[in-house]
């Protein structure tokens, strides 16, 4: 029975890639800088002391990071008994965003340039805004700028509730984000507005990767909170991913947990499981792993590392989340049967010690575990697509156009 379990620790980079300078990210190192901050006693909120990741260390995380940067992450166990195959991968895709990273993991790198709204103020074209106001019958809009999602809620959340004007904002990523209050504006209405925005962006040739619905609750600044009802409207990958090939060629199952289905625009996904928060994502993953049959991929995105800690530049929160993940990891590993493969990886970096609030261009860890996986170094992988090619070969699918089989 062949099953693969892919766990994406969203934004968990392990050192700047060779082309990081182009992105303003030379020297970024999500894992390394978190570990250093912990060792200096600068991440003692909700946790304390050096970064402790014994289970990830046994899978080779520390060694992969050392291969990536030349430095072993401080606090991790150098003498851990390695039980998995480990390496680090560079990104071939042109961007450092979520869809690019995930599509490349599935064997389809993004070799074109996304469209971006690069103006920090008055970010969106007036023609686009006018169409959204007219088609969605809006009283106007707020924002129209670059912002962090939590910051803009405190700035504009109250005005939004009073006026009914949605909050439009973007970032360095190829995104159009819309924040609305779940109760005063309504969740279904927000989703409808996002559908309209997706249509207008596509029809207008803007080449924007995602429209993201950002529902929130609360009644005043400091109390506004984003809910788990986020919804991403992505464009479809430009070629068949290994997910789609598994479904098409083997009649296989691909179970999406968290935001995976949205990232792939639902293509190549046979089942969606919604879960919010690290523990809930873990619980859902465990349930689906227990049920998974032959020719199945269970694919989970642990978004909190990125959304709650990376973008918010919360070092202690990121460290605590990693330690929680590590504590629960044996529960997943215990469900890996004789022919199964468990892959732990990331989609980009988001160094919480780095200036700004955006992603960082980094290598990702590639940790592979299973009874038939030979422990040891996989070295430097030249593209995330090596993961997709490896999974395609494992299931006996037609080869992907990019990537090499690692096993």
Curated annotation (Swiss-Prot):
GO biological process: 2-deoxyribose 1-phosphate catabolic process; 5-phosphoribose 1-diphosphate biosynthetic process; metabolic compound salvage; nucleotide metabolic process
Named cofactor requirement(s): Mn(2+)
GO MF annotation list: magnesium ion binding; manganese ion binding; phosphopentomutase activity
Positions bound to Mn(2+) 1: 10, 347-348
Amino acids binding Mn(2+) 2: 306, 311, 359
Assigned EC number: 5.4.2.7
Pathway participation: Carbohydrate degradation; 2-deoxy-D-ribose 1-phosphate degradation; D-glyceraldehyde 3-phosphate and acetaldehyde from 2-deoxy-alpha-D-ribose 1-phosphate: step 1/2
Subcellular location: Cytoplasm
Keywords of this entry: Cytoplasm, Isomerase, Manganese, Metal-binding
Recorded superkingdom: Bacteria
Co-factor binding details: Binds 2 manganese ions.
A cellular component term, taken from the record's GO annotations: cytosol
InterPro entries on file: Alkaline_phosphatase_core_sf, DeoB, Metalloenzyme, Phosphopentomutase_DeoB_cap_sf
Presence of keyword Membrane: no
Keyword check for rRNA processing: no
Catalytic activity: 2-deoxy-alpha-D-ribose 1-phosphate = 2-deoxy-D-ribose 5-phosphate; alpha-D-ribose 1-phosphate = D-ribose 5-phosphate
Family from the record: Belongs to the phosphopentomutase family.
Function, in words: Isomerase that catalyzes the conversion of deoxy-ribose 1-phosphate (dRib-1-P) and ribose 1-phosphate (Rib-1-P) to deoxy-ribose 5-phosphate (dRib-5-P) and ribose 5-phosphate (Rib-5-P), respectively.
HAMAP family linked to this entry: Phosphopentomut
Protein name: Phosphopentomutase
Source organism: Yersinia pseudotuberculosis serotype O:1b (strain IP 31758)
């Amino acid at each position: 029975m062949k099953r693969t379990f892919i766990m994406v620790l969203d934004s968990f980079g392990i050192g700047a890639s060779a082309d990081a300078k182009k992105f303003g990210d030379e020297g970024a190192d999500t894992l390394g800088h978190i570990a250093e901050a912990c060792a200096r006693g600068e991440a003692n909120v909700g946790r304390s002391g050096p970064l402790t990741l014994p289970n990830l260390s046994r899978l080779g995380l520390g060694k992969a990071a050392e291969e990536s940067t030349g430095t072993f992450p401080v606090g991790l166990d150098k003498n851990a008994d390695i039980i998995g195959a480990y390496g680090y991968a560079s990104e071939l895709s042109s961007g450092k965003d979520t869809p690019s990273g995930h599509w490349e993991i599935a064997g389809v790198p993004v070799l074109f340039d996304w469209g971006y709204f690069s103006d920090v103020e008055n970010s969106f074209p007036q023609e686009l805004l006018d169409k959204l106001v007219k088609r969605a019958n809006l009283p106007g809009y707020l924002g129209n700028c670059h912002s962090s999602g939590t910051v803009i809620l405190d700035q504009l959340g109250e005005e939004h509730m009073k006026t009914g004007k949605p909050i439009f904002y973007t970032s360095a990523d190829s995104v159009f984000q819309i924040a609305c209050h779940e109760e005063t504006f309504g969740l279904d209405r927000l989703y409808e507005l996002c559908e309209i925005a997706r249509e207008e962006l596509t029809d207008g040739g803007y080449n924007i990767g995602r429209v993201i619905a950002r529902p929130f609750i609360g009644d005043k600044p400091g109390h506004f909170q984003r809910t788990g009802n986020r919804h991403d409207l992505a464009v479809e990958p430009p070629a068949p991913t290994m997910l789609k090939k598994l479904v098409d060629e083997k009649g296989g199952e691909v179970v999406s947990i968290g935001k995976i289905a949205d990232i792939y625009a639902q293509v190549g996904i046979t089942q969606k499981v919604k879960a919010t928060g690290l523990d809930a994502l873990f619980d859902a993953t465990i349930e689906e792993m227990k049920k998974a049959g032959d020719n199945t991929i269970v694919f989970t995105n642990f978004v909190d590392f990125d959304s709650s800690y990376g973008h918010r530049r919360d070092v202690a929160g990121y460290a605590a989340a990693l330690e929680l993940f590590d504590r629960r990891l044996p529960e997943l590993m215990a469900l890996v049967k004789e022919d199964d493969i468990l892959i732990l990886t990331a989609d980009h970096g988001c160094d919480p010690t780095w200036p700004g609030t955006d992603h960082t261009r980094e290598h990702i860890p590639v940790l592979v575990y299973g009874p038939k996986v030979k422990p040891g170094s996989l070295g430097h992988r030249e593209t995330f697509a090596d993961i997709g090619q490896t999974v395609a070969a494992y299931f006996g699918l037609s080869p992907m156009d990019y990537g090499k089989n690692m096993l």
